[in-house]
Amino acid sequence: MNVLSCSINTLIKEGLYEISGVEVGQHFYWQIGGFQVHAQVLITSWVVIAILLGSAVLAIRNPQTIPTDGQNFFEFVLEFIRDVSQTQIGEEYGPWVPFIGTLFLFIFVSNWSGALLPWKIIQLPQGELAAPTNDINTTVALALLTSVAYFYAGLSKKGLGYFSKYIQPTPILLPINILEDFTKPLSLSFRLFGNILADELVVVVLVSLVPLVVPIPVMFLGLFTSGIQALIFATLAAAYIGESMEGHH
């Protein structure tokens, strides 16, 4: 028992700590208290948030009875997000529109910022700026938020009866059903991170090999796939929330 206890303590103190320290690429750090944070991720995330907040201010400023072109655009975006939420969640989609919309818009603008904004012009002491979703920490954080959201949705709708889904349709599936809830955020985070990182790497390689014409179509393809990835993430998040409220599917 002592050996087993020591092994578990070693895994918790060393193994999990090492796993949490896995990094991709070089990073510029800020020291905040006793923690090191990835400064470039915070910088680019703040830029994306500023763009979204500025757009929101423009959207609600001086609304017209006869919508202008800009107002039409923002209303179209809102209707699109509402349709995605309603399709995946069902009749009780209303309270979840802000959450799904925030996920979609943050990921969409983050992905596009990696292709459209000249991050490389800004020099850092170490590492370089890139899209926030190009960092595994961002995508994991978004996936964990989604996990918290669908657990909250299920518990608020069904109370402790929510956990009965783990033994449906048979208690034999209990380990698999529990494992499924852990794999959902992993699949969300790694899918988004992998696609955005791969897209930026392909563009960088092509620019280094053929700097003029060839990378342009790839960049346009990257813009398209970036939008698709944002839609997939938001759609799956809404589907998970809807599933937790409706029951085991």
From Swiss-Prot:
The chain crosses the membrane at residues 40-60, 97-117, 136-156, 201-221, 222-242. It is found in: Plastid, Chloroplast thylakoid membrane. GO terms for cellular component: chloroplast thylakoid membrane; plasma membrane; proton-transporting ATP synthase complex. It is a multi-pass membrane protein. Keywords: ATP synthesis, CF(0), Chloroplast, Hydrogen ion transport, Ion transport, Membrane, Plastid, Thylakoid, Transmembrane, Transmembrane helix, Transport. CDD domains: ATP-synt_Fo_a_6 (cd00310). It holds the Pfam family ATP-synt_A. It comes from the Eukaryota. Belongs to the ATPase A chain family. F-type ATPases have 2 components, CF(1) - the catalytic core - and CF(0) - the membrane proton channel. CF(1) has five subunits: alpha(3), beta(3), gamma(1), delta(1), epsilon(1). CF(0) has four main subunits: a, b, b' and c. This is ATP synthase subunit a, chloroplastic. It comes from Lepidium virginicum (Virginia pepperweed).
